[in-house]
């Protein structure tokens, strides 16, 4: 057993673990971070970061994690709906500075670590003089290794490679978590801390510590593949392909490599037998690929190097209860959404920012003060909902809208794209929500139902006078469908 008692133990060194560990360490806390495998991971998600995620990295003083990994700028979205296309830029900085300004974590920023450097692929002047906010795309593993190195460079951080097998509770008070038990080559080692934070990701072993029913649902899968030297219709944009097929995403992760993620609608993964994945991509996705990108897609298709990952949803539970003192969930172990909108890292990083601010020593002098931490966690749960509810509800609603093929959904899809084509606030609002720079749930509510009513209006126009009775019936179908695919998720995110 380790004789050292830490202020905080962080379980997991994915994207979120190193950020909260670094923030605590810079605030003077003694932190232990435990990771099962410190080698570079190879994942097909966590490669596209929205502008609100970039903002969070600045607030944490960890923006340089996107440097020197051949990251590429992301300046907005290119949407292809059947044979129609529209390009949507990210919000203007002058607007973003009002709706979601940069507010550094106290003691985490030194005036240098919140500044991006120029490197072989990123130009600081391009970022600084662009009138709009930017996101970035990169290889997940390279980005993660930079985050980990920044974390390990902190004098107050101790990094250990081990598997956490058990959450330790106080024998005299089982409601209080006092540390973790780990399995190492030398045997079992226990570590103790005043506060334990689990950031062990989508397959979290410890989220059930809060409740045995705290489990995610799987509604679909992503099939991922890499394209080499692909030509895309809009450089520097995330590409979303919509139409008579499940949605697909295309975005560059380096100057020469492009990621494609294709939704497979099923609660079970696609079969690896009989070339089922190959045939699915060839028959359903290939016809929708932009013509410039087809050669590279065909080449990747023939290589048959497919990666499959579940798309999971889990709303965040309230934390700080009397029977879980000294224990916090953070990141994907707490909360997940459909990755269609690329908002996972954005939500997690902003949670790190918020928690580091709320637990700063000027508010919580000692992590042993469980009663005070419980109060701060209630504030955390309430304040995180603005961004969390927007990103999570938007992701699952867009997936539900574009992944199924019922008549009301087809009417809504058509109305949604036509709504974007109107321009102005019909596109500025939605991209502000998607980017995380407009974290306002009621704005999402307004735009979603504006789309619904506009869809009904367009359908009346298309049906004409003779088709009025049918259009009237379809109007009720469309509005009912809109309520069903949107309201329960928004309610769950806001109220739970």
Curated annotation (Swiss-Prot):
UniProt keyword annotation of Endoplasmic reticulum present: yes
The reaction(s) this protein catalyses: squalene + reduced [NADPH--hemoprotein reductase] + O2 = (S)-2,3-epoxysqualene + oxidized [NADPH--hemoprotein reductase] + H2O + H(+)
Source taxon at top rank: Eukaryota
Any one annotated GO CC term: endoplasmic reticulum membrane
Deletion consequences: Impairs ergosterol production and leads to increased susceptibility to terbinafine. Also leads to susceptibility to polyenes, nystatin and amphotericin B. Impairs the localization of the membrane-bound transporter CDR1. Reduces the formation of hyphae.
Functional pathway: Terpene metabolism; lanosterol biosynthesis; lanosterol from farnesyl diphosphate: step 2/3
Annotated binding of FAD, by residue: 15-16, 35-36, 43, 148, 164, 332, 345
Cofactor(s) for this UniProt protein: FAD
InterPro entries from the UniProt entry: FAD/NAD-bd_sf (IPR036188), Squalene_epoxidase (IPR013698), Squalene_monox (IPR040125)
GO molecular function, one term: flavin adenine dinucleotide binding
Regulation: Activity is completely abolished by Triton X-100, deoxycholate or Cu(2+), and partially inhibited by thiol reagents, rotenone and antimycin A. The allylamine antimycotic agents naftifine and SF 86-327are potent inhibitors and show apparently non-competitive kinetics with respect to the substrate squalene.
Membrane-crossing segments per the record: 4-24, 431-451, 466-486
Pfam family, one: SE
Principal EC category: oxidoreductase
Xref: Gene3D superfamilies: FAD/NAD(P)-binding domain
Single biological process term from Gene Ontology: filamentous growth of a population of unicellular organisms in response to biotic stimulus
Bilayer disposition of the protein: Multi-pass membrane protein
Keywords attached to this entry: Endoplasmic reticulum, FAD, Flavoprotein, Membrane, Microsome, Oxidoreductase, Transmembrane, Transmembrane helix
Tagged with keyword DNA repair: no
Major localization class: membrane
Site (Important for enzyme activity) location in chain: 77
Function of the molecule: Squalene epoxidase; part of the third module of ergosterol biosynthesis pathway that includes the late steps of the pathway. Erg1 catalyzes the epoxidation of squalene into 2,3-epoxysqualene. The third module or late pathway involves the ergosterol synthesis itself through consecutive reactions that mainly occur in the endoplasmic reticulum (ER) membrane. Firstly, the squalene synthase ERG9 catalyzes the condensation of 2 farnesyl pyrophosphate moieties to form squalene, which is the precursor of all steroids.
Homology family: Belongs to the squalene monooxygenase family.
Protein name: Squalene epoxidase ERG1
Organism placement in taxonomy: Eukaryota, Fungi, Dikarya, Ascomycota, Saccharomycotina
């Amino acid at each position: 057993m380790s004789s050292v008692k830490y202020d905080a133990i962080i379980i997991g060194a994915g994207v979120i673990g190193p950020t909260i560990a670094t923030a605590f360490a810079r605030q003077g806390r003694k932190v232990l971070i435990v990771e099962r495998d410190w080698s570079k991971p190879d994942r097909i998600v966590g490669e596209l970061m929205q502008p609100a995620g970039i903002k969070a990295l600045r607030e944490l003083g960890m923006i340089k994690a996107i440097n020197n990994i051949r990251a590429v700028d992301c300046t907005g979205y290119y949407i292809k709906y059947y044979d129609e296309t529209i390009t949507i830029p990210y919000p203007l900085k002058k607007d973003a500075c009002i709706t979601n300004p940069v507010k550094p974590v106290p003691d985490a920023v030194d005036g240098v670590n919140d500044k991006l450097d120029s490197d072989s692929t990123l130009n600081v002047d391009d970022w600084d003089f662009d009138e709009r906010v930017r996101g970035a795309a990169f290889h997940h593993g390279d980005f993660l290794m930079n985050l980990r190195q920044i974390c390990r460079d902190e004098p107050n951080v101790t990094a250990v490679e081990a598997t956490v097998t058990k959450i330790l509770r106080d024998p005299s008070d089982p409601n209080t978590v006092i540390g973790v038990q780990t399995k190492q080559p030398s045997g079992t080692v226990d570590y103790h801390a005043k506060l334990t934070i689990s950031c062990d990701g989508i397959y979290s072993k410890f989220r059930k510590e809060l409740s045995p029913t705290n489990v995610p649902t799987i509604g679909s899968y992503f099939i991922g593949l890499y394209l080499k030297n692909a030509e895309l219709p809009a450089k520097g944009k995330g590409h979303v392909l919509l139409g008579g097929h499940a949605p697909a995403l295309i975005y560059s992760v380096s100057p020469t490599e492009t990621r494609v993620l294709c939704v497979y609608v099923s609660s079970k993964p696609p079969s690896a037998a009989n070339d089922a994945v190959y045939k699915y991509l060839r028959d359903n996705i290939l016809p929708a690929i932009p013509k410039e990108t087809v050669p590279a897609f065909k080449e990747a298709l023939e290589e048959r190097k497919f990666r499959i990952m579940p798309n999971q949803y889990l709303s965040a539970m309230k934390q700080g209860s009397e029977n879980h003192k000294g224990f916090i969930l953070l990141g994907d172990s707490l909360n997940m959404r459909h990755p269609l909108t690329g908002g996972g890292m954005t939500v997690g990083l902003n949670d790190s920012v918020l928690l580091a601010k709320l637990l700063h020593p000027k508010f919580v002098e000692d992590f042993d003060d469980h009663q005070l931490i419980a109060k701060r966690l209630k504030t955390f749960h309430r304040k995180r909902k603005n961004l969390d509810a927007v990103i999570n509800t938007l992701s699952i609603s867009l997936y539900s809208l574009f992944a199924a093929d019922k008549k009301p959904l087809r009417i809504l899809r058509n109305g949604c794209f036509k709504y974007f084509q109107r321009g102005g606030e019909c596109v500025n609002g939605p991209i502000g929500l998607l980017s995380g720079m407009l974290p306002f749930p009621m704005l999402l509510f307004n735009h979603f139902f504006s789309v619904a009513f506009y869809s009904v209006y367009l359908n009346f126009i298309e049906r004409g006078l003779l088709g009025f009775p049918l259009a009237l019936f379809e109007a009720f179908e469309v509005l009912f469908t809109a309520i069903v695919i949107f309201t329960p998720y928004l309610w769950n995110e806001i109220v739970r």
